[in-house]
Each structure stands twice: as structure tokens, then as C-alpha cells.
Regions:
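N-terminal beta1-alpha1-beta2 module of alpha/beta enzyme domains
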Residues: 2-73, 196-197, 220, 286-289, ...
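Hydrophobic faces of well-ordered beta-strands that scaffold small-molecule active sites
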Residues: 20-28, 51-55, 76-82, 105-113, ...
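Short, acidic/polar
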Residues: 32-45, 92-95, 203-213, 230-246
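Acidic (Asp/Glu)-rich catalytic clusters
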Residues: 43-47, 66-75, 96-106, 212-217, ...
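Conserved, mostly hydrophobic/aromatic
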Residues: 45, 49, 69, 99, ...
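Alpha-helix-loop-beta-strand connector modules within alpha/beta enzyme cores
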Residues: 60-79, 139, 269-283
Length: 321
């Protein structure tokens, strides 16, 4: 990615060496037929001890469903699985920031690189090959982090007497010229509670997202447990993944394949209890815990860069006056 700025925000700067234990997540497919049940289902899963919910596209946009669930849940993380390729990067980053705001710091991004050949035409583009798809995913992820980092935590001053809402010197541009898109920042949304949202890649999405995204840029790996073939071997799979010395750290264990039209919880409560009894997953989250904290990630630092300051034009004029 080529940018007009010398500084980028990478996973290496924001990720801890390793988590304590991975968070247990349950995947919900956003089927429009289930729209009236999502809130109740999310609350039941939270009560059962799930640490997070992932939202996979089943017809309704995953970010929209996550936004619907944010006010009706209290502690679970919310990670929409959404495309990083055939999107408007600025809008995507802003939507995820907004989700972090309304969930009070419980939002994350399960990065997906779209490979369905019918999708590009819906946004007026031609399909990308595998290598270009991986490059685009990396560019969009890096750009999103620049946008998320474009407001300092103290940028909003709300000086009523002085008629000043924000301090422009505490904003910075996210100017990007990538291979297929360009972006001008800063964000139109103040810095969200987590600053930099956690970005994870599921094993099933690793090939399409590319090795650079999965191994270098993302904050960790998602291990999938498909319950359509039963729960046999689930504990062993989680234990084995935690012992792997090479590759990205497993930060999320995701239960997939639930029949949401029947008994949606099925064996999930028992599986959660068994995994916790063996010390294989993190404890259930408490209210007020950010998703970064749950995943074992440190607080995301702000990266001030004088070259990117939003008031740089005014400063330049003053320097030459």
C-alpha cells in the first residue's frame, strides 16, 4: 500500500505476544427469516456464557445485525464477518467504529475476503484474481486502522463557552493511495472506545485473505468448531490449537453450524461448560470489559504523527507569515 504518510498502524504494534485463553464465540447467520429472534437468541447465548457472537452473512448485512444486538446485550463481543475487498474502505471503517461506540467497546472485525464471482458486478467492479484479492484485503485493513487512529482520545473538547467542539490539532489525516482506491481522512466519527478494533481471520477465510493479512496484520486466528458433525473431538481440537507453537495465536474459538431454526442453543451450553472446566477458554465476560481485553490484547495506543495533523495547512501558513 502506498500512502502519503510515513506511518502505518500494524498488528505488531497492537497485539500482545499471546492471550491467556481464547474466547468462545457462537456464529449467527443473518437469515432474514430469523430477524425477530436475533435479540432473544443473543441474550440466551450471553446468559449461557458465550464470550462473543460472530455474525455471518445470510441475507442481512452482518454489521447491521450486530448494531441491532449491541443495545440488547451487555458483555458479549460482537464481530461481524464482513468483506474487505468489494467495499468502500472509508465507509466500512466508519461503520465498524460506530459499532464500537454503540456497544461500548465490544466490537471487532472478522475479516472476510470475498471470492464469489457474482459479487463484483453488484458494485461495478470486475473480479480480482487471488493475489489481487489478498493485496486488496491488506490495503483495506491497513487503511481502516489509519482511519480508526485519526482522532486522538482527547480530540473532542466540547468547549461551549468558546464555541469549540473539537481540537483540530488532535486530528490527523489518513491519506491513502492504494492500488485500486484512495482515501482521505480523518474519520467523520470520534475515536471509538477501543481505538483500534480487534481484527481476526477464521481458518476458513485464511486462503482468500492471504498470508500477509492472516499471519502479519490480523490480531489473531479464529478456530472453528463445526457442530453439524457433533461435539466429539471439540475439546481435543481446542487443546491442540492452543499448543501450536507456530502461526497466528488462536484468540477466538467459534462454534459454527448451529440449526437456528430448531433448538438454536443445542449443545452449546454443555460445550461451554466442558471447555471452561478444562481451562481451555476464557471466562465469561463481565460488563465493562472491552473485546480487546477479552482477547488478551493490550489497549491500543494512539499514534500521533505531526505530518498528518489535520490543522497542518493552518500551521504551514503561520510558519510562512
Amino acid at each position: 500500500m502506498s500512502t502519503t504518510t510515513p506511518q502505518t498502524v500494524t498488528r505488531a504494534e497492537t497485539a500482545a505476544p499471546g492471550p491467556t485463553r481464547p474466547v468462545l464465540a457462537v456464529d449467527l447467520v443473518t437469515d432474514p427469516a430469523l430477524v425477530g429472534r436475533f435479540a432473544a437468541l443473543a441474550r440466551r447465548l450471553e446468559e449461557a456464557g458465550a464470550g462473543a457472537l460472530t455474525l455471518s452473512d445470510g441475507g442481512l448485512h452482518p454489521i447491521h445485525v450486530a448494531a441491532h444486538l449491541a443495545p440488547v446485550t451487555r458483555a458479549v463481543g460482537l464481530l461481524p464477518r464482513t468483506d474487505a475487498v468489494y467495499v468502500e474502505p472509508f465507509h466500512l471503517a466508519t461503520q465498524l467504529m460506530s459499532l464500537d461506540h454503540i456497544s461500548h467497546g465490544r466490537a471487532g472485525w472478522l475479516l472476510h475476503a470475498q471470492t464469489d464471482p457474482s459479487v463484483p458486478a453488484t458494485v461495478g467492479r470486475s473480479p480480482l484474481d487471488r493475489a489481487a484479492t489478498a493485496r486488496e484485503a491488506a490495503d483495506v485493513l491497513e487503511t481502516s486502522r489509519l482511519i480508526w487512529d485519526s482522532w486522538a482520545p482527547d480530540a473532542v473538547v466540547r468547549d461551549t463557552a468558546g464555541g469549540k467542539y473539537l481540537d483540530a490539532s488532535r486530528l490527523q489525516y489518513a491519506d491513502v493511495e492504494a492500488e485500486t482506491f484512495s482515501v482521505r481522512g480523518p474519520a467523520i466519527t470520534p475515536r471509538s472506545p477501543q481505538g483500534l478494533l480487534p481484527v481476526l481471520v477464521a481458518d476458513a477465510d485464511r486462503a482468500a485473505a492471504g498470508e500477509r493479512v492472516a499471519s502479519e496484520l490480523a490480531d489473531g486466528r479464529v478456530l472453528d468448531l463445526d457442530l453439524r458433525s457433533g461435539t466429539d473431538g471439540a475439546l481435543e481440537a481446542v487443546a491442540a490449537a492452543r499448543e501450536e507453537a507456530d502461526g497466528p495465536v488462536v484468540r477466538l474459538v467459534r462454534v459454527v453450524g448451529l440449526d437456528l431454526g430448531a433448538d438454536p442453543l443445542g449443545p452449546v451450553p454443555e460445550l461451554i461448560d466442558a471447555l471452561r472446566e478444562q481451562g481451555l477458554i476464557a471466562p465469561a465476560p463481565v460488563v465493562g470489559t472491552s473485546l480487546r481485553e477479552q482477547l488478551g490484547l493490550p489497549p491500543a495506543p494512539y499514534h500521533p504523527d505531526p505530518v498528518r495533523r489535520a490543522d497542518r495547512a493552518r500551521l504551514t501558513r503561520e510558519d510562512h507569515s
